[in-house]
Amino acid sequence: MGNIESVDGQSEMKHHIMPLKVPMPDPTELEERFAIVLNSMNLPPDKARLLRQYDNEKKWDLICDQERFQVKNPPHTYIQKLRGYLDPKVTRKKFRRRVQESTKVLRELEISLRTNHIGWVREFLNDENRGLDILVEYLSFAQCAVMLDFEGLENGEDFSLDKAKSWSRSIEDLHQNGCNTLVRSARQSVLRYGSTSNSKTIKNSRLVSQKDDVHVCIMCLRAIMNYQYGFNLVMSHAHAVNEIALSLNNKNPRTKALVLELLAAVCLVRGGHEIILSAFDNFKEVCKEKHRFEKLMEYFRSEDGNIDFMVACMQFINIVVHSVEDMNFRVHLQYEFTKLGLDDFLEKSKHTESDKLSVQIQAYLDNVFDVGGLLEDAETKNVALEKVEELEEHLSHVTEKLLDVENETMTKVADLEKQLLHKDKELAVIKETYESASTQVHTLRRMIQEKDAAFQRHNNIEKQLLELEQQGTIRLRKQPDGDIAIETLGAGAVAGTPLTDLRSLTVGMSTIGGLGGTSAVPVEAVAPPPPPPPPPPPPPPAPPLPSEVESIPIPPPPPPPLPGPSPSVILSVGLSAIRIKKPIKTKFRLPVFNWTALKPNQINGTVFNEIDDDRVLEELDLEKFEELFKTKAQGPVVDLSCSKSKVSQKVINKVQLLDANRSKNLAITLRKANKTTEEICKAIQTFDLKALPVDFVECLMRFLPTEAESKLLRQYERERRPLDQLAEEDRFMLLFSKIERLTQRMSIITFVGNFNDNVNMLTPQLNAIIAASASVKSSPKLKKILEIILALGNYMNSSKRGSVYGFKLQSLDLLLDTKSTDRKMTLLHYIALVVKEKYPELANFYNELHFVDKAAAVSLENVLLDVKELGKGMDLVRRECSLHDHAVLKGFAQTSDTQLDKLAKDAKTAEEAFNNVVLYFGESPKTTPPSVFFPVFVRFIRAYKEAVEENEQRKKQEEAMREKLLAQEAKQHDPKVQAQKKRHQQQELIAELRRRQAKDHRPVYEGKDGTIEDIITVLKSVPFTARTAKRGSRFFCDANLFDESIC
C-alpha cells in the first residue's frame, strides 16, 4: 500500500471522489498558506520566484493540489485501531470481526513506518500518540496465548490460570510508569483470571496468535529502529526488547528468524549487547528456564528442517558470544552454550548440505577460544619473558659497570695525555735552547779563529815593514794622533818594493789595526819616483802624479757581502724590478671575478707597469665594498690581523688528516654553530638542545667519523703528537670521535628535536586517511551513484559480455571514453543528466566524500613507517634513561609518551579504516594504497563537476537557440507569444512538482538513519568473525551513524 497517490489517480479522484473546489480565502490567508506550501516544496530560489508571480487563482489551485497530496492515514488512525483490539470490553463476536483486519492494519502500519517521511514516524512515536507503547502492548497481548499453549493448557485450568496470571504481570510491567485508562482496563481484565473476561482475553489472544500479527509487529519495530530517533526510544523502553526476545516462543520459524536477525544487529551496537543479555535474563525468568538460552538451544535443535531459522540462530549465537571485547566474559558466554550442548550439536551439523549454515557454523568454530591451549602458551611465554627480563637486567647492570669503568679509564688516559703534551712542550723548549747555544758557540769559535789569523797577518806585515825600513826604502813616523805614517825615501827603495806591494802592506796594517783596536796607518806623502834605472834592470812603472801621491790613506775594510734579494722585489736580467703582490686578507668571502690574467713576463712595457693599484686600495672604502659583495652565509667578522696570523700559522704549521673536501664542509658546518669544539661536545654529551639547534645536529650527523678517519686519529694520538698542531676540523673530529655512543646520542638528539614537528606532520595525514575512509564507506549517495553506473554498464554490455555484479573503481576513469553516437556526449555526461532529472538528491554526492583530496596525497605506508620509527626512537630514549640519569630525556619521555601513544592508535585506526573501505569496494589493500584508491574519487568528482557544468552550458545554448526561434516566430505571429511562453514555463514547473509529489521512492534520510537495515544486510552477506568484531563495532557505532545515546 502506498502513502501517496499517483498522478493518474489524482485526475480520477478529482472528477469522482474529491469534493467541489473550496472557495478561495481572503488574500492575507491565501499568502500565508501559499508561503507554507512553498516552504514544504523546498524549491530552488529561481523556481520559487516564478511561483510567487502567479495570480491568486493559480496560487489557490496549487494550494489545493498540495493539500490533496497528503499521507493517506495519519498515525492516530492506526493507534485507535490497535487500542480497539486491546479493549477488554469488546464482545467476542465484535472482537472476532475486528481482528480479521488486524494483520492488514499492521501491514499498512509497517509500510507507513518504512516509507513515510520522518515527521510521520515522529508523530506516531510522540508523547501524545505513544505508538511504541501500543505496539509493545499489542505484541505482548498477541503472545499471551502462545505462552499458555507452550506450557500446555491441557495440564489443568488452575495451571493455565496461574500462567495467565504470571503472563499478565509481564503485561502489567510494560506500563508500570502509567498509561491510559483503556490499557489499565485491559490489564485489570487479564488479572481477573478467574473471571469470564480473563478467559475471554486469553481466547482473544489465542485468536490473534493464529495470525501473522506477531511477525508483522516485529517488522513494525524493525522499521522504527531503522531510524535513529526510533532506535533511541526502543533501546530506552523498559520492555520493548524483552518482548521482542519473548517472540522467540512464536511457532512460526520465519518469525523466530526475524527476531534473531534483529537481536543480532542490536548486539553490534555499542551498549546493545548488555541490553540483549538482559532481555534473555528476563526470558529465562518468564519462561522458567534453568539456564539462560535454554529455549533457544531447544528450538535450534528441533527446527533442523528450517534452514533459514538455523542460519539466523547460529549467526545470533556467534555474535552474542564473540562480539564482546572482554575475553574472560567471552569465554564465559562460550562455556554457557557449551553446557547447553552446542558443541556436540555443531559437531553433528557441520557436515550439513546447506552452504549458508555451514559458513555460519565454521565462523563460530573459528572464533572459539581454546582456553587450554592459550593457558599453555601463556605459561611458556611467561617463563620465557621472565628469563629474558632477568638477562636484560643482568646485561643492563654489566653494561652500566662497563661504561663506568670506561669513563674512569678515559679520564685517566686524558690526564696522562695532558701531562705528556706538557712534557713534550718542555722538551721542545729545551731543544730550542740547546740549538741556540750551539750556534753561539760555533760563532764564537769562528771569530777566535779569524782573530788568530788576523794577528798572524799583522806580525808578517810588521816584519816586512821593518825589512823595508832597514833597506832604507821607507821611513816610519808616528803622528800626533797615534797613527803611523810611511814616507818613501830614495830611489833605491823603489827598486826593491813596488808601490802595489806597499799598498797591500798598508791595507794589511789597517786590517790588523782594526782587529787589534789600533788606528789605521795612513800614507801622508810619497816622494817622487827616482830617476829611471840603468838599462839592465827593468824599468819601473810610471810613478803617479804629484797630486795623486800627496797622501794615500789606507782604505777601509771590505764591506760585507750583499744580502739575498728582498721578498718584495724580483731582480730579473734585462727586465725592470717587479714587486710581488702580497695576498689581501678580507674580512668576508667575496665572489670571484673570472678575468683572464697576464703573466709577469707580459707586464713589462705595458700600462700595468705604470699604475699602482695598492694606492687605489688605500683610497677606497673597502669595508663598504665587502658588505655589498660578500657571499651569503658568512660567519662573524674576524679581526684582520688575527686572521692573517692564523692563516699563516695554518699554512705553515697545521696538520690535516681529513679529506680536503670533507674538512672544508665540516668547517662550514662548525661555523654555523658559532661555538667552540669543547662546547659542542659537551652539549652532545648532555643532550642540550638549547645549546645546539636541531638543524645543526642534523648537519653534523653527516660527519660522524668513519672507520678510516678514526684509525688515522688514533694513530696520531698513539704517536703522542701535540693536538695544537692539528687543523681545527681535525681537532674537532678527534674530540668528536671520543664521545661515548656517539651515533646513539646524535640519533636521540635528532629524535627529541624533531619529535613535535614529526607528530604535527603525521597527525593531519592520519586524520585525512581516517576521515576519507569513513566518508567514502558510509556515503549512501555514492553507493547510489555506483548503482546507476552498474545498471547502465550492464545494460550496455549484457548482450555481448553478460551482466556483472560489480566493477573495479578504475572503471570510473573510462566513463569519459564511452561516447554517444554523435560523439557529443560521454557516458558520464549522461549519468549527470540522469542524476539531475531522476535523482536530484544525489547531485551533491561529492559533499559526503570528505578529505579524499588530502588522503590522496598521503603515503600510508611511509606514514606507518614514520610512526614505527618514532616508536623506535622513543624506545631508544627510554633505554638511555634506564642506563643513565638524564633529566632532559626523562622530562621529554614523560611529556611525549601520551602524544606517541595517541599517534600510534591513530595510525592503527587509519590502517584498519583504510583496509575496510578498500575491501568494501572490492579492492586489495596490498595492491591499492591510498595514493591509488582516493585519487580515483578525486578524478571522478572533478570529471563529474565538469560534466555537470558542460551540461548546463549545453542546456543554456539550447535554450538560447529556442528563444531565438520563438522570437522569430513571435515576429511572424501574435505578439502574445511571450505571455504564452511564460505560461508554458509555469505549466512545466507544476508538472514537475506533481511528478515529484507522486514519485514513490524511499527518501534519503540525513546522516544516521537506515543503519539497522545495513547491519542486517551485511551480516547476511558476510559471517561475523571475532577478528572483525572490533572494527565492525566501531563501524556501526560511528558518529556518522549513531549518536552517543545509541553507542
Curated annotation (Swiss-Prot):
Which chain positions have N-myristoyl glycine-type lipid attachment? G2
Query: Does the keyword field hold Membrane?
Result: yes
What the record says about disrupting the gene is: Morpholino knockdown of the protein causes profound defects in angiogenesis. Although sprouting of the intersomitic vessels occurs, the endothelial cells fail to extend fully across the intersomic region and there is no apparent formation of the dorsal longitudinal anastomosing vessel. No other obvious defect is observed in the developing morphant.
**Membrane topology type, per the record?**
Lipid-anchor
Q: Describe the location of the GBD/FH3 domain by residue ranges.
A: 22-462
* Domain FH2: start-end pairs: 580-970
Q: Does the keyword DNA-binding apply?
A: no
Per UniProt, residues of the DAD domain are: 1000-1037
Q: Which family does it belong to?
A: Belongs to the formin homology family.
Q: What is this protein called?
A: Formin-like protein 3
